[in-house]
Amino acid sequence: MAALTAEHFVALQSLLKASSKDVVRQLCQESFSSSCLDSESLLDKTCSSLSVPQGEAAQLLQALHHFTRLVAFRDLSSAEAILALFPENFHQNLKNLLTKIIVEHISTWRAEAQANQISLPRLVDLDWRVDIKTSSDNISRMAVPTCLLQMKIQEDPSLCGEKPSISAVTMELSKETLDTMLDGLGRIRDQLSAVANK
């Protein structure tokens, strides 16, 4: 994640216009979420609570969002580590207040960030059935055993929105394909065991 720039710290100085520490605390909490950058209501609320124009409020929200995300990304949970991010000439009381607020909320923010990260689909259920597949033509009649494998897969909830996030995939496997698949899965299991034992 990109480091903070001088412009970010200049924008953070707008918090000095807040009427109370609670206003600063509320803005820090609301600016952590990724949706804050597109929220017109939060922008309007920031303008009115700090008595600043929209451009300045937008820069402040972006700087606060970037700052809180950077702290969570780097897993900085001590006041000393957070204070070290500020430039020397930054307002001392504001620096201490922001650090205190971040230390109070960092564990919640990290949990929120981890819960909202995009992940790969996960296998939630597996079922199979062995069938005899028959085919015939004028020359011969064949009976071939096949495996019908059904996997239930859960998509990342953040990508699905309102739609159900579990889908089923059914595939037909011949004995040869199943042997190849089991051999590959056996090698994967061995590699996982080797990594786990290190």
UniProtKB/Swiss-Prot annotation:
CC per GO annotation: cytoplasmic vesicle; cytosol; Golgi apparatus; nucleoplasm
Domain COMM: 122-196
GO biological process, one term: cholesterol homeostasis
N-acetylalanine carried by residues: 2
Superkingdom of origin organism: Eukaryota
CDD domains: Commd9 (cd04757)
Keyword Aminoacyl-tRNA synthetase attributed: no
Principal location class: nucleus
This protein's UniProt keywords: Acetylation, Cytoplasmic vesicle, Ion transport, Nucleus, Sodium, Sodium transport, Transcription, Transcription regulation, Transport, Ubl conjugation pathway
Location relative to the cell: Nucleus; Cytoplasmic vesicle
Protein family (similarity comment): Belongs to the COMM domain-containing protein 9 family.
PANTHER family linked to this entry: COMM DOMAIN-CONTAINING PROTEIN 9
Role: Scaffold protein in the commander complex that is essential for endosomal recycling of transmembrane cargos; the commander complex is composed of the CCC subcomplex and the retriever subcomplex. May modulate activity of cullin-RING E3 ubiquitin ligase (CRL) complexes. May down-regulate activation of NF-kappa-B. Modulates Na(+) transport in epithelial cells by regulation of apical cell surface expression of amiloride-sensitive sodium channel (ENaC) subunits.
Subunit structure: Component of the commander complex consisting of the CCC subcomplex and the retriever subcomplex. Component of the CCC (COMMD/CCDC22/CCDC93) subcomplex consisting of COMMD1, COMMD2, COMMD3, COMMD4, COMMD5, COMMD6, COMMD7, COMMD8, COMMD9, COMMD10, CCDC22 and CCDC93; within the complex forms a heterodimer with COMMD7. Interacts with RELB and NFKB1/p105. Interacts with CCDC22, CCDC93, SCNN1B, CUL1.
Name by which UniProt lists this protein: COMM domain-containing protein 9
